[in-house]
């Protein structure tokens, strides 16, 4: 084990704990300050990912042995980091050898206080029960909506399995056959997902070659769920589409692909900074049919339009993203879910006013909570009888809860994608 990956992980945890950003985001910031090898960066990301899952288990274990007042931050962080990884199954080899390498690499920055506590690392041998690695409220919540057995499997699955990488080909810049040929020449395996044509599972041993295609705008990485949502909506060339809460623009681009760059997409987001980033990305991907508007969608939108299709992908608790960003499990609280639910209802209501008669609106979140999904749709349908929930033409995933059978739920352990909710609504009159 290269000690540089552990040292890099420690350096990333300081801004993470000081500012509240995720360890993976902090790693990105820290790594820009010094040149690291791809191997070191990959290992550091793996260490921080595992730490985010098991740090609560490691912390409880260490609290039973060491008083927090007796140990400095660096020593505590090193112990928690290595303990978390041992619990999570990362093989560091001989701990004595690892510590010796760390001591040598850190030099004068090595905390002497740590020496008397190193023995605890050799005592860790049992992996805790899965509930310890999640807040109790979250495990109980999942048991309530999924049942105890499915909830336990779901939680264990997303901590054990590496999320797959999905991509679509940017046919707005190059023909599909040519992109596939370029990928093959670079030993990038693109295996088409048999559930929906046009989305690929990416297997690339040469990450530099993959990055090269991405830097050319020929391939874009995104989750299966985003592609599925756009496919359900079925945007067509020459249609008028409204994309609400659109940044960073993944669904905007996927919609433009379906429309073959013909028609109009009006993208709305509350953040001018995100809008500027989205405009830059759309230009890079050769999307030519997007008009952008800065507006707060929790208030009536500053437009007088009735459009063919509306995409509503509001801010959410991101409970469906925990398998990609395990740090989220420790920062999401029930109060956040209630807050998001209220915000989502306002955004959905304001967006729905711009659907023409016979038009469609798709509502989606990367959350698996009922409050942000089924409750929002139930409340909306109750006060908007001119809309109805319709069955999607592509039946993937599970049916919605609370008798909303036409809605769709996706889960990592059953659908190998982010946890996701989708509801397709049609305006009848």
Regions found by a protein language model. Give the residues of each.
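S-adenosylmethionine
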Residues: 1-429
